[in-house]
Amino acid sequence: MFIEVCHTSGIWLQDYLSSSNLSLMKKIIVSGLWLFFLLLSACNQRANTYFEKKLTYPDILTSDQKVKLAAYVIPTQQQYEWQQLELTAFIHFGINTFTGREWGDGSESPTLFNPTDFDADQWISSLQEAGFKMIILTAKHHDGFCLWPTRTTTHSVASSPWHNGQGDVVRAVKEACDRHEMKFGIYLSPWDRNAESYGDSPRYNAFFTEQLTELLTNYGDVHEVWLDGANGEESDGKVQEYDWARFYHVIDSLQPNAVKAIMGDDVRWVGNENGVGRETEWSVTPLQPGISEATAIENKRLNISPTADDLGSQDIIEQSQTIYWYPSQVNVSIRPGWFYHPEEDHQVKTLARLVDIYFQSVGMNSVLLLNVPPDTRGRLHEADVEQLRQFGTYIGNTFDNEKLIDGDIPWKARSGASREYNIIPDESINTVMLQEDIRKGQRVEKFIVEGFIDNKWVKLTEGTTIGYKRLLRFDNTSSSRLRVTINETRDIANIHKVGAYFASALEAETEDLHGNETNLNSNQIK
């Protein structure tokens, strides 16, 4: 899909056409292609062509031209609005909450599900006060227990004693979200250890499609559908071939504004469950979305996977045939487990750890998905709520107090370009934020930030990618000015905003950055 915007740029093609090693026929072909793009743009009296979500390269492009053209791949409106959320919350709640397990086997009795003081408004208000903008509810986990009274199975809240079988967790949570103006998403596990049809691919795909249809039809707007890749072959020995194309069609038809995450083609998994993004995080990547034979073949050819360190470098782009706007989501739990376990009440992540996670997710061009599991009462535990409160207060106190006078003025930067900013007099800083206008692509490959100290420029920090947002911390410093230099960029970079802040010191985190978490394979994320 081609999107026309207001700034003219045909440099990559001009360079291409002037190269001496191309045949006349190839130049004619490319000239024709570019003329076609310009005609498309002229329909709206605009001259620059961007590629929304996906670009397949013509075979005749050189490596350098591929890299330059990657700078013109942009997000869809849904992807852009999703990225702006920054903070989202996972709610793992279900039969596992009452059995003490992480993965149920589907044999659990629905009578076990009986929260004693269910309060969805408490969930949403606690998360909203901490700055979260969307929640994703586990409507069904791998055990197959459904949190809504589905027509597809009796393994649901309708068979539980909660509200005498008349309750609907999905509806209660969605209505609470609406009351608090919180966006709502669903997690629906394709792997179902209770469904009799699981392993009979056509039958189960119809079963799953019906469940998906119920959730996307009966509860109003849904903003994200989180599709897990676990399929249980190793656990149960049943081989189920999911009809992903069918599932995508249902989502796109019933909830066109929702992003499809993880096994979907709008949002990708960062590759670990530790709350740690990449130092170099490209939203433009040749990583093929989803799980299919063609996807596996191409990803293997490029030697990339969701867990790879490099998903978007020039070397990877040069080898690719198709590239995607496929941004990263960082998922991690506030506790060791994903579901509530009372023995973990004293293992809730510290404020220092939560702040680190924020800098290593939102601050590394990703969206954070922080899991906060309700307890057997049906409430967020007081320990979790207190840490959320402290986290929200800390982030607000830090980033609501801008120290730059003129950081919100957008600018365009070629490689080597700099801009200076004035710092409010007598203010100390130790944190910097940079943002690109990703509606015009992600382009910056390397930058440096300096402070004017003792009449000379001193390096404070440096980095590689920026993307939607990059946050960097450094030692406390008092400087009258800040200078940002874009050392390397794939094309003219569109710097949307630069900010400088002072973050209060926190007690050092004693555990290793990665804790005791385990990296998982991409097809067994949860």
Per-segment meaning from a language model:
Residues M1-F51:
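Bacterial Sec-dependent N-terminal signal peptides
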Residues N476-S478:
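Surface-exposed, short loops/turns at beta-strand junctions within beta-sandwich domains
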Residues E509:
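C-terminal functional segments of enzyme domains
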